[in-house]
């Protein structure tokens, strides 16, 4: 709970200190992973009471919001009940909702914590706690996307799409934690968890592909105009309309038991971990699509697909670790872990477009696939024709069955060292390596492939962590992690997926493992007397033999053929700097500045050079392996590279006194992208904003606040995305009742109705711009009530019980969790 939620009469003593991590507190080994916490000592008889708030709101455009939290404190326990529902795209609780589309979020839950009052880490100490949570989101979204794919020879393929969707997702989670110290040297920790989720979805997508920019050809809304457009230069490639709907569910239960024993020698520990999990899931989907190929004399492809994908997974594991002090401030830690994992998955795809042809071959020319789907002929017996309906509609090529049995082992060796100096400085570092042998047995069936594969691999994962604590407010940290990743077993099987008529994929038996190097450097400092602080960070990620999909694009049909391949040259790096300082003798002014600079080098393989030799593999019976072998042999697969720089800056200056707070701010984001294959992929995108804000604290417990900013975008092909938006928000609130613990407020968002949601993204081979719908402009009227009743009967009789606290603004609640120091 924030300090402002607690009346000062409750507090006997307050101190700040660096709380050690769970690992340090249990093992006695200082790992340097502290966090600064406030330790509150509450007056006798005052650790007993209720704290909470209620907030209800309704507004224009049928927007509404309601949330509450009620917290019960006793000497050795804490209970919290929270709940909310809104359709303002605010998920509350941080585990629901979203920012795209229009989302209605519902959540509720209970959190509790209890201990028996024994001193920390003493014999007989027992702690338990947990929570049960429910959340649901219902969303409606509309998206418009313009995409450009970079092709060899200075060419590009352009696609434009519009989509509408409805989604429902709900989750139930239950977590429990039990910790016991049978004696001062032994710690037992048990953590079981359960979760259930289910959802359903519907979407309608309409897209069109061109071999030249439709905007340069004169179209303003390509998706709406392409069907009736004369297309004098024949730039239309295909049009695709697709409907999807489906549902899914998942159940999971897991648990972890940890037993730690501190041995006689300080720093010597033995730890045993046992755990396991079991989950089941299923998803069903139905899709219908129609593709028109304009470069192929009006050829059309219609598909009707039903898919069901049940799966079952379980695993169990054990881990034994031992820590031995070898020198002063130095310990050596070793561990061994073994895990058995089972996964059984099935995908059954039923296709109705192939059924019509099969029935016609038996002389049933008047029975259509759509009639069968609609159930018109469900009661008809086709056995007299020698037809097994279930076999006819099963898409053997795209149905699959896979069973995995994995035996994973991990051997870890870690060296930890700490040096402490008289001036208060500390040096810490740990270095280690994981060796991870793995055996996987897979049984796989798909189309004509029915195989069993056994794979033995060995992964390595080195890591290094250095921390120099320069002072209580300043430190330097350096971290490095190396990771080896193996291709999935399915990616190694050369079997085709033709379920999408415009995107066909296959595996690659020649894939090799990939390697990633990641590093982070962080430095921060804070001058308490001057209230000045800064933080500087740098990071980088280098990928070797990264696995990326190589794409061959057919300019006649708009169809893509994809295969995973190893490729070198993918890396990215970035920096971030933040600075904050108070200004003036009274520290009334505050200056904040931050800047980020990111660079990415994305690589991929692509080709559109389909000569007569290549077309022999796709115009007849599709042969993906032959196609990629031919293109690779002749050097027709070209490496594409997109280099992009992203620069962001923000500056804010505030002035504050008891009456008002006023500020000005400005920011910009610049994206510079260059593609070595297509000059049209060389883009410069700008987003910049500037504005101000004011807060007035009026003498009759009224507060007025407002902010305004000019936000602009530049560099988009679709002129409607190059916007100038003046965003103005305002709020007025009034506290009332004797203790000022009730508030009524009026909020008006986007008063001028100009805000929109637009984004741009890059990869090695394409660029995409996306617009998403949302309700940005509305008025909300809030009624907020807060209460704070702390202290037992004796304390209240002494005059300390009527303490309605000074909670300000909307109380968002949250999931408590733990005692929060000694409160």
Q: What is each model feature region?
A:
Residues 1-19, 75-80:
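Short acidic/polar hinge/loop motifs at secondary-structure boundaries
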């Amino acid at each position: 709970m924030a300090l402002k939620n607690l009346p000062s009469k409750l507090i006997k003593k307050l101190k700040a200190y660096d709380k050690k991590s769970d690992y340090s507190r249990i093992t006695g080994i200082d790992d340097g992973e502290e966090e600064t916490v406030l330790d509150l000592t509450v007056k006798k008889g005052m650790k007993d009471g209720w704290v909470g708030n209620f907030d209800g709101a309704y507004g224009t455009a049928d927007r509404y919001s309601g949330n509450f939290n009620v917290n019960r404190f006793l000497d050795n326990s804490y209970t919290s009940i929270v709940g909310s529902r809104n359709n303002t795209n605010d998920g509350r609780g941080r585990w629901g909702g979203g920012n795209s589309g229009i989302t209605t979020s519902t959540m509720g839950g209970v959190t509790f914590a209890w201990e028996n009052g024994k001193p920390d880490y003493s014999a007989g100490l027992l702690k338990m706690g947990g929570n049960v949570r429910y959340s649901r989101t219902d969303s409606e979204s509309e998206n418009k996307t313009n995409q450009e794919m970079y092709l060899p020879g200075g060419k590009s393929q352009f696609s434009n799409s519009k989509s509408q969707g409805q989604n429902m997702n709900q989750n139930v989670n239950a977590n429990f934690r039990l910790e016991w110290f049978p004696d001062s040297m032994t710690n037992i920790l048990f953590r079981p968890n359960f979760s259930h989720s289910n959802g359903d979805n519907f979407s309608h997508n309409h897209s069109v592909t061109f071999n030249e920019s439709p905007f340069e050809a004169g179209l303003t809304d390509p998706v709406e105009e392409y069907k009736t457009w004369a297309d004098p230069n024949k730039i239309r490639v295909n049009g695709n309309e697709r409907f999807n709907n489906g549902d899914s569910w998942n159940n999971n239960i897991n648990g972890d038991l940890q037993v730690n024993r501190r041995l006689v020698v300080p720093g010597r520990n033995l730890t045993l971990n046992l755990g396991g999990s079991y989950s089941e899931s299923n998803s069903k989907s139905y899709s219908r699509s129609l593709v028109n190929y304009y470069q192929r004399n009006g050829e059309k492809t219609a598909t009707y697909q039903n898919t069901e994908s049940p799966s079952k997974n379980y695993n169990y594991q054990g881990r034994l670790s031992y820590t031995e002090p070898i020198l002063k401030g130095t310990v050596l830690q070793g561990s061994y872990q073994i895990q058995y994992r089972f996964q059984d998955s099935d995908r059954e795809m039923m296709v109705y477009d192939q059924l019509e042809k099969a029935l016609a071959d038996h002389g049933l020319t008047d029975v259509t696939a759509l009639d069968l789907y609609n159930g018109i002929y469900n009661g008809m017996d086709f056995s007299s024709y020698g037809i097994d309906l279930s076999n006819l509609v099963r898409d053997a090529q795209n149905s699959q069955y896979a069973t995995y049995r994995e035996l994973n082992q991990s051997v870890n060796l870690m060296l930890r060292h700490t040096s402490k100096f008289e001036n208060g400085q500390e040096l810490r570092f740990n270095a280690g390596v994981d060796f991870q042998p793995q055996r996987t047995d897979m049984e796989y069936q798909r189309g004509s492939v029915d195989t069993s594969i056994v794979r033995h691999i060995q992964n390595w994962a080195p890591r290094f962590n250095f921390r120099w604590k320069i002072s209580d407010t300043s430190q330097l940290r350096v971290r490095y992690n190396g990771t080896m990743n193996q291709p999935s077993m399915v990616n190694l099987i050369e079997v085709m997926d033709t379920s999408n008529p415009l995107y066909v994929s296959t595996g690659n038996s020649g894939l090799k493992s990939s390697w990633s190097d990641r590093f982070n450097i962080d430095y921060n400092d804070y001058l308490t007397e001057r209230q000045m602080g800064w933080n500087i960070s740098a990071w980088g990620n280098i990928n070797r033999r990264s696995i990326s999909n190589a794409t061959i694009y057919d300019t006649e049909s708009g169809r893509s053929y994809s295969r995973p391949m190893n490729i070198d040259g993918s890396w990215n790096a970035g920096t971030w700097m933040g600075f904050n300082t108070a200004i003036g003798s009274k520290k009334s002014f505050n200056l904040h500045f931050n800047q980020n600079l990111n660079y990415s080098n994305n690589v991929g393989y692509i080709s559109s050079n389909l000569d007569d030799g290549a077309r022999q593999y796709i115009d007849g019976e599709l042969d993906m392996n032959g196609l990629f072998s031919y293109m690779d042999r002749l050097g027709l697969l070209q490496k594409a590279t997109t280099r992009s720089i992203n620069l962001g800056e923000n500056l804010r200056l505030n002035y504050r006194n008891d009456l008002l707070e006023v500020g000005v701010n400005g920011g910009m984001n610049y994206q510079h992208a260059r593609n070595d294959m297509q000059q049209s992929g060389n883009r410069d995108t700008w987003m910049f904003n500037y504005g101000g804000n004011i807060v007035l604290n009026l003498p009759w417990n009224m507060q007025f606040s407002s902010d305004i900013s000019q936000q602009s975008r530049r560099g988009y092909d679709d002129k409607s995305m190059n916007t100038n938006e003046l965003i103005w928000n305002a709020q007025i609130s009034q506290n009332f009742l004797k203790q000022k613990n009730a508030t009524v407020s009026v909020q008006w968002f986007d008063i001028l109705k100009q805000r929109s949601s637009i984004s741009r993204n890059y990869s090695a081979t394409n660029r995409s711009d996306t617009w998403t719908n949302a309700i940005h402009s509305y008025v909300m009227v809030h009624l907020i009530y807060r209460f704070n009743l702390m202290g037992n009967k004796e304390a209240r009789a002494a005059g300390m019980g009527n303490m309605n606290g000074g909670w300000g603004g909307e109380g968002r609640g949250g999931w408590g969790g733990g005692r929060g120091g000694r409160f």
